[in-house]
Every structure is written in structure tokens, then in C-alpha cells.
């Protein structure tokens, strides 16, 4: 039987695009971990997806996971839209290129290693763990130390 854990994630951006960050909390029976990082130039949606990627990359075993996010973009993207995008050769229903393809591909790959229930929660409603993720994401955005290379390449193209 797979171990059960809960993951709380949030992304933030000071301006969109602008400096951004993510916050992650992973908690289980004998596990509690906080992860955060900030980027010089990125978008809020990229930070939301990145938070999920970083959370899943940090796991070394297979888990039964509940991922809590306040991003409908992330939840709908990974649970509904990605199937349509892939069938449309990474185009939206409006025939536009899907944004953040690099992150969606990585997230889908990592998601297949676990059983994940993607849970949308309303942000800023006194959920202690989610509020902590929000705090970590904002602090990281204010103190960036990393470059979102793919985003900057697209931005400078």
C-alpha cells in the first residue's frame, strides 16, 4: 500500500510577468518539509505549475497524494485540459499554442509516478498550511535567486 501524504502549493508573482516564487509544504505521518524558491522573471501560472513539479520531484517513493492548490489553471490544466492539448498537438481549442508546455510535459510525467487527487481550495481563507505556502511564495518572489530560462528565452524571442 502506498504511503499517504498531503501537499500544499502556491505560486506568486510581483507583476505578471515579474519576479516570482513558489511555496510547497509536504506532510505525512513522519514527514514535514517546506520548499521555496524565487525567480527573477516569470509568471504566476508558471510558479503555480513549478510548485507542483518541485513537490513531486522531491519525493523518492511512490505515494497516494492529495495536492491542494488555489489555482484553477493548474488543477484544470493537469486533470482536464492536458488531454485535449495533447490530442490537438499542444494547441488550445482556439488553435493557439499552449503556454508553459515545458512545465506541463514535466508535470504530467511526474504525476504518473503517483496516485494524485488534485484538490482546489479557495485561497486566503485561513488554511494554515496554504497560507504558509502563500507566504513562502511571496517572500521568495521578493528575494529571487534563480532564472526561469525557458520563460526568459520565450520573452526575449
From Swiss-Prot:
Pfam families: RNase_H
Biological-process GO terms, alphabetical: DNA replication, removal of RNA primer
Catalysis: reaction(s): Endonucleolytic cleavage to 5'-phosphomonoester
Top-rank taxon: Bacteria
Domain RNase H type-1: 1-142
InterPro entries recorded: RNase_H (IPR050092), RNaseH-like_sf (IPR012337), RNaseH_domain (IPR002156), RNaseH_sf (IPR036397), RNaseHI (IPR022892)
EC number(s) from the headed UniProt entry: 3.1.26.4
Cofactor(s) it depends on: Mg(2+)
Subcellular location: Cytoplasm
Positions of Mg(2+) 1 binding: 10, 48, 70
Keywords of the record: Cytoplasm, Endonuclease, Hydrolase, Magnesium, Metal-binding, Nuclease
GO cellular component terms attached to this protein's record: cytoplasm
GO molecular function: magnesium ion binding; nucleic acid binding; RNA-DNA hybrid ribonuclease activity
Oligomer status and interactors: Monomer.
Described function: Endonuclease that specifically degrades the RNA of RNA-DNA hybrids.
Entry similarity comment: Belongs to the RNase H family.
Protein name per the record: Ribonuclease H
Annotated gene: rnhA
Amino acid at each position: 500500500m502506498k504511503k499517504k501524504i498531503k501537499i500544499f502549493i502556491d505560486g506568486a508573482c510581483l507583476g505578471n510577468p515579474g519576479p516570482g516564487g513558489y511555496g510547497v509544504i509536504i506532510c505525512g505521518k513522519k514527514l514535514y518539509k517546506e520548499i521555496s524558491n524565487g525567480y527573477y522573471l516569470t509568471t504566476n501560472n508558471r510558479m503555480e505549475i513549478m510548485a507542483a513539479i518541485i513537490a513531486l520531484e522531491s519525493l523518492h517513493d511512490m505515494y497516494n497524494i492529495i495536492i491542494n492548490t488555489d489555482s484553477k489553471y493548474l488543477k484544470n490544466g493537469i486533470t482536464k485540459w492536458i488531454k485535449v492539448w495533447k490530442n490537438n498537438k499542444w494547441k488550445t481549442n482556439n488553435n493557439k499554442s499552449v503556454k508553459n508546455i515545458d512545465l506541463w510535459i514535466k508535470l504530467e510525467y511526474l504525476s504518473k509516478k503517483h496516485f494524485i487527487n488534485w484538490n482546489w481550495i479557495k485561497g486566503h481563507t485561513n488554511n494554515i498550511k496554504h497560507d504558509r505556502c502563500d507566504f513562502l511564495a511571496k517572500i521568495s518572489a521578493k528575494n529571487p535567486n534563480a532564472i526561469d530560462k525557458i520563460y526568459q528565452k520565450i520573452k526575449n524571442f
